Amino acid sequence: MTAKRLRIEDDALLRGRGRFIDDAHQDNQAFGHFVRSPHAHARIVSIDTAPALAAPGALAVLTAADLRAAGVGSVSVHPPIKGRGGAPIVEPPRPALAAERVMHVGQAVALVVANSAIAAQDAAEAVVVEYDAIDPAIGAASALAPDAPQLWPEAPGNLAIDWGFPRSENDANARAVEQAIKDAPHVARVSYVNQRVVVASIEPRGATAIYDPAHDRCTLRVCSQGVAALREGLARIMGVDRSRLRVITEDVGGAFGMKSSPYPEYPALLVAARMTGRRCTGCPPDRRPFSATIPRGALFSTARWRSTPRASSSPCGFARWSISARFSDHSARRLQP
């Protein structure tokens, strides 16, 4: 461990020769800008893309209908875990571009493609989206309250999964814990919150999509934390065999866990490249990295201790509620022993 090791990765970076997403622009490159929801929860009444298409430099405006026609499926990244009694996790659909409803501030509603990044941003501001705002559920505790707005019909009570150890209420350890709490002369409780955490990487998320019509193949240059898993996920989302999709990651300016999953922007950019016949870059994420980035979900925890007359104590129970970090503030799951 004390032996000197030669670092070979620094030379190019120190000389300014790194290859990040913004370093690979080419002639005839197109740029994408996403129209995002200003609401935490709302119905989409209508989307008028005509003014944006008429804007200078605009090439295309994609909505959920375009992605649906291209065969793009749900952008879901939930692990296939099971809760008590073997019940699977509830996995509501997550479209790459919102269709009927938006479920969090910053959810992508449309993608505008233009000849320059500035032209794409200007055209995106011309997209007219009419919303009908709905009461949101903010935070895990409020989302699980009996009078909370029902967010997904697939998840009654906004509960995605009830998971924990032991998995059975009849487990001997569970009965022993409850009996110890019942018999204890004193029981102490403490509740605490681990706040949500979002990553502020030096290089924001971004990707460049390229379509090869001669071989009907797509390439995605993306700052990621592993191309193999990302390729598998994107191939499933796009509804294509993985042999038709190539994922390339070169230098990455920080990640810390938030660049490991397929994001909704990626399939949208791939479809845009196929529709326009142009390399299409979306970087950075519209100057809204926090509202468009998967965070670590907040944890709301309660612990119980039993104490004896001799002042000794031992933990007896632990319950935890968590906001789902895989979609938004409005899909809560509970982890409870």
Which residue stretches match the model-derived regions?
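Buried hydrophobic positions in well-ordered alpha/beta secondary-structure cores of metabolic enzymes
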Residues: L14, D27, A52, S116, ...
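Thiamine diphosphate
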Residues: D251-R274, C283-P284
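Conserved beta-alpha junction segments in alpha/beta enzyme cores
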Residues: V177-M238, G297, S324
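Flexible, low-hydrophobicity surface segments
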Residues: M1-D162, I294-P295
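Proline/glycine-anchored alpha-helix kink/cap motifs
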Residues: A207-Y211, E232-R246, P267-G282, W305, ...
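Alpha-helix capping and helix-loop boundary segments enriched in small/acidic/polar residues
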Residues: V197, R221-Q225, F256-Y263, P289-T293
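Beta-strand segments within the central parallel beta-sheet cores of soluble alpha/beta enzyme folds
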Residues: A64, R244-E250, R278-R287, S314-A319
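Gly/Pro-rich active-site capping loops and adjacent beta-alpha segments
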Residues: A69, P92, M103, A119-A143, ...
